[in-house]
């Protein structure tokens, strides 16, 4: 498996589905998706559970908020990919996001971390 995409989640019901769907829509499909729910009290855990039928999807359910770093480390421990991509629960990936990250990562063996370009959008404003 080429990549593991890791999404830590805490009360992300307003964004999580769009975030996950943007990952499934990637041009690069050799990846697994790992969502770590950190004790959410909104509907985001139910959203996360709705993807459990996909064999490339893994869900870790924490009964309480163990912190962002711990959740990320749980995802890394489960990951089987050659590369790991951390993705926020309120982010949206363009269809070629993972493909371009992997191309860049493989272009130079000295690269140890890569950050894509990002745009900050305010909900409802279009800017």
Features from the language model and the residues they span:
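Short, well-formed alpha-helical segments that are part of the catalytic scaffolds
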Residues: 12-25
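Cell-envelope/extracellular polymer assembly enzymes that use nucleotide-activated donors
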Residues: 2-4, 32
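Acidic metal-phosphate-binding loop of nucleotide-sugar-dependent transferases
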Residues: 66, 90-92, 118-120
